[in-house]
Amino acid sequence: MAKVIKFDQEGRNAFLKGVNTLADAVKVTLGPKGRNVVIEKSFGAPLITKDGVTVAKEIELEDKFENMGAQLVKEVASKTSDVAGDGTTTATVLAQAIYRQGAKLVAAGHNPMEIKRGIDKAVETLVAELKSISKPIKDHKEIAQVGTISANNDKTIGDIIAEAMEKVGKEGVITVEEAKAMETSLETVEGMQFDRGYLSPYFVTDPERMEANLENANILIHDKKISNMKDLLPVLEQTAKSGRPLVIIAEDIEGEALATLVVNKLRGVLNICAVKAPGFGDRRKAMLEDIAVLTGGKVISEEVGFKLENTTMDMLGQAKKITIDKDNTTIIDGAGAEGDIAGRVKMIRAQIEETSSDYDREKLQERLAKLVGGVAVIKVGAATEVEMKEKKARVEDALHATRAAVDEGIVPGGGVAYLRAMSTLDALNLPTEQQFGVNVIKRALEEPIRQIAQNAGVDGSIVVDKVKNGKDAFGYNAADDEYVDMIQAGIIDPTKVSRSALQNASSIAGLMLTTEAMIADKPKEEGAMPAMPGGMGGMGGMGGMGGMM
């Protein structure tokens, strides 16, 4: 297929047009007075959103060269969202400002490679400064403030996120689901829960709630199917003597073995419950090993030389309480040694660091949470489907941003941190051409606060000057149209978000500035439609078919 190639200024102008089109659509959502963007959907109602990355993902331009520019800036937004969970609009605004200023300098004959070097050195200095002014975040109130800001100033969401993080800890898993009701609520699960229920309803001990509740129970963990009762008999006899309940977790329990367990349960000989093992394949083996470590037992597996018929009581795990319903099993207060659990946690953390698959990482984090923290579910409620989707996206954003704040601390929000960090750039002593790159960054750092002010209907230049003349956390509160101490007012940004937005924006903008040629497929020329074949003219006679009605 033929290609079209654009060079130098012609290509950069097309890039700039695409960058501006995407950034202008995204940046109207910035700040507390950010506007909504309505996105048409081919099925169902239009989507109304104030989330920058959602807007960016929907944009596809007709001109291929302009679209290249737009897609590269889209990459800035999605990368920032992946790393920090928020700051997508800020990153887009910064990328547009850096590229726009840099493109002017390149058009005026400056060396793009030197400008890029200047930009990189400036960003390196700024990141170090942002980290030094960062304030660690610890208490419930500060976590709630970060959550509130990231959820577009929705205090309810901020409070729920803070409560969830307090309950499950830093390592815990917090998931977001749609609720059936109007209210947004929080549910937490203590202990280890996995998504497998009892194999027969006859194991239930609480008929009203259809649950099996076993206290001070022994746990038999086996990695194969159990169908032969003979293999189980020795361990059942030992359990009957001990008088403690028994939970059997195995790949499956069927036929004669399951029938015998049910009969013994109904006769009151044994308080017992059988559950299928969670997961599949290698992940199942790992999860059974987790359960064994948590409860202080062993996985009865022929791979390591343990046979089911030779199982002794010291191989069984123990837990203070086990609750099993038809879908889930929850093990509370397992008897595993703290040192063993810590070793297992360390191993899973190492696997999280090494894996390149997002899916594997998510599953490993779930396993980690089940061992050390717990699981919390935020159920998002709303009046309509459209509001539900918008609110759920905000909760997910706020959750990511709050985690980022706990990781690296917080800085004054509303674009103030960038203005305060800017002063460190004055100390840089670089060659003249590189200094132009530093100046590009200086101008770009004003852009987020300028845009926040403009979205609030205020002149951005006046706000920038006034905030620059202030000190420390002094900044502009666009929500109330007043100048305040941003930290005291609870207007804060996670350091990770501010840092990632700047690094990603400068990286892509620098690449675009140093691009000299752009190649795209040549559009197909739409010629005149081919004439109808001559023989089809006789179809005109079909008009007479009307009389057949």
UniProtKB/Swiss-Prot annotation:
InterPro entries associated with the record: Chaperonin_Cpn60_CS, Cpn60/GroEL, Cpn60/GroEL/TCP-1, GroEL-like_apical_dom_sf, GROEL-like_equatorial_sf, TCP-1-like_intermed_sf
Function: Together with its co-chaperonin GroES, plays an essential role in assisting protein folding. The GroEL-GroES system forms a nano-cage that allows encapsulation of the non-native substrate proteins and provides a physical environment optimized to promote and accelerate protein folding.
GO cellular component, one term: cytoplasm
Subcellular location: Cytoplasm
Subunit structure: Forms a cylinder of 14 subunits composed of two heptameric rings stacked back-to-back. Interacts with the co-chaperonin GroES.
One BP annotation, GO: protein refolding
EC number: 5.6.1.7
GO molecular function annotations of the record: ATP binding; ATP-dependent protein folding chaperone; isomerase activity; unfolded protein binding
Organism whose genome encodes this protein: Geotalea daltonii (strain DSM 22248 / JCM 15807 / FRC-32) (Geobacter daltonii)
Main location: cytoplasm
CDD domains in UniProt: GroEL (cd03344)
Record keywords: ATP-binding, Chaperone, Cytoplasm, Isomerase, Nucleotide-binding
Protein name per its UniProtKB record: Chaperonin GroEL
Chemical reaction(s) catalysed: ATP + H2O + a folded polypeptide = ADP + phosphate + an unfolded polypeptide
Positions annotated to bind ATP: 29-32, 50, 86-90, 414, 477-479, 493
Annotated family: Belongs to the chaperonin (HSP60) family.
